[in-house]
Amino acid sequence: MSSPIQPLPLNVINLIAAGEVIDSIAAVVRELVENALDAGATRLVISLFPESWRVQVADNGTGMTLADLRHCALPHSTSKIHQLDDLWKITTLGFRGEALHSLAQVADLEIASRCTSDGVGWCLRYQSSGEPLREEPTAIAPGTIVTVGNLFGKMPVRRQGLPAISTQLKAVQSFIENMALCHPQVTWQVWHNQRLWLNISPGKTPQQILPQLLKGVHYHDLQFVSQGVKSPQESTQKDLDLIEVTLGLPDRCHRHRPDWVKVGINGRIVRSPPVEQAILVAFSRTLPKDRFPVCFIHLTLCPSQIDWNRHPAKVEIYLHSLDFWQEQVSKLIEQGLRLSPQTLASAAQNQRVGKLLKASEEKASYRVDAKDHQTDANAVGLMPLKAVAQVRNTYIMAEHSTGLWLIEQHIAHERVLYETLQDNWQLIPLETPIILTKLSDNQVEQLARIGLEIEVFGEQLWAVRTVPKLLSTREDCPEALVELSIGGDLQTAQVAVACRSAIRNGTPMTLSQMQELLDQWKTTRNPATCPHGRPIYLSLEESSLSRFFRRHWVIGKSHGI
């Protein structure tokens, strides 16, 4: 006979709950870091001693009074919410009041803290119930130091079941890097067994942070754009919601996995497959095949738009008006991918230019003017590009106010045509149909799928009565239609039509024709790469040309005096 149903003892309830909140070393770091950021910290020092199951987090936040220290580790004790309605007004990273109590349940907990207004700090040790065990005054700078020792000492099975130390440290690193992106103004130091392991300097935007996290990515490989947006459901909202996008320019950096497609909401990285998919779609046909973008989206939204109370670690949320935010993210990414004064100015720092200059730099030493040739980000419109020559009937040489550009004519035109086809996939009827032979059923279905009018004309013969307008006057239109029939979606067909219809390399162009192409290309949505992901242009800024021709040499030395 089974045992009768009865309530669990309180200590068992607390231990079960603590095991759900604190399940690893990374979870300890997560909870303490979020508390520190909620306290306004701008500098965090995290010390890890994983072999001895000890973690310490020190911050320069507002600190706690002695009265708060006595209550902070009690169950469900928090200063962040006070009533039911507050659950829909959450502006902090933490709100449940579970973290410190859970730590007291599964580890030895000690907290030292001092408010700026107090002349002395206090250090308290806690019982597993969260009640203070010992308290004493201590000399400490304003802020808080939380020390967690003997982690999972009361749960030996949990210790044995945890991943290897290296795996746990990787989880800590991933969390810190994510938080650094969401809070770029914060200085981060992580020590492992008293050796500096991770150091992240602060910045104004994630554009300064991301190069510290991703090897091979530089500041000028990235673009940062932001925009205030009025929430669709908040008619009385005074402050605009904010969308910030930090993206890798597709001709300069991309990944073989989508591991750097990240979404942050109100200071925390979250899993949001719909928004992540919107990011991938926005980058479609800008990257090489099987490559993925570097893109970090951070949404700062009205609390009423979000329900955080979905996952213990708050990595999953309910987001109201999801379709609206997907659309806004797509629009802002599109804006970031366009040519702008910022990208024109940063093109001089392109790694491809650096490689061209490297050989010259190795053979001679010369003084380089350290001026930073930045363009006013508030400039209206784009810098004019003036066509000056054609190189080998393939590259357009264009001049602008700060240097020289080389643009490959075929893929620049391909980008123009592709976006035109995206906006207006125009099919026109033919006076005389094109007859195709020996098509499979799949090929016939494919042509019909992309909108072409096709019908049987005889045995193994098919008549195509409508074709894309760009192909209608081409002599190789039948071959192009066979190519389109091979497979792929409408987007693939549009790329194929654009590629076949674009100006071929080796075709002479007049200055007016080149200028017309430049004017069309620089206003496209994704001018950096062709639809196959190849870079379209190379920028040689005046500063780079000066370096190559050694215009900064000291005159006497350059003449051997």
Swiss-Prot record:
Domain of life: Bacteria
BP GO terms, sorted: mismatch repair
Transmembrane segments: none
Keywords: DNA damage, DNA repair
SMART domains: DNA_mis_repair, MutL_C
GO CC field: mismatch repair complex
Keyword Transit peptide recorded: no
InterPro entries membership: DNA_mismatch_repair_CS (IPR014762), DNA_mismatch_repair_MutL (IPR020667), DNA_mismatch_S5_2-like (IPR013507), HATPase_C_sf (IPR036890), MutL/Mlh/PMS (IPR002099), MutL/Mlh/Pms-like (IPR038973), MutL_C (IPR014790), MutL_C_dimsub (IPR042120)
MF terms in GO: ATP binding; ATP hydrolysis activity; ATP-dependent DNA damage sensor activity; mismatched DNA binding
Coiled coil: none
PROSITE patterns: DNA_MISMATCH_REPAIR_1 (PS00058)
HAMAP family, sorted: DNA_mis_repair
Primary role: This protein is involved in the repair of mismatches in DNA. It is required for dam-dependent methyl-directed DNA mismatch repair. May act as a 'molecular matchmaker', a protein that promotes the formation of a stable complex between two or more DNA-binding proteins in an ATP-dependent manner without itself being part of a final effector complex.
Family, per entry: Belongs to the DNA mismatch repair MutL/HexB family.
Protein name according to UniProt: DNA mismatch repair protein MutL
Organism of provenance: Rippkaea orientalis (strain PCC 8801 / RF-1) (Cyanothece sp. (strain PCC 8801))
Classification of source organism: Bacteria, Bacillati, Cyanobacteriota, Cyanophyceae, Oscillatoriophycideae
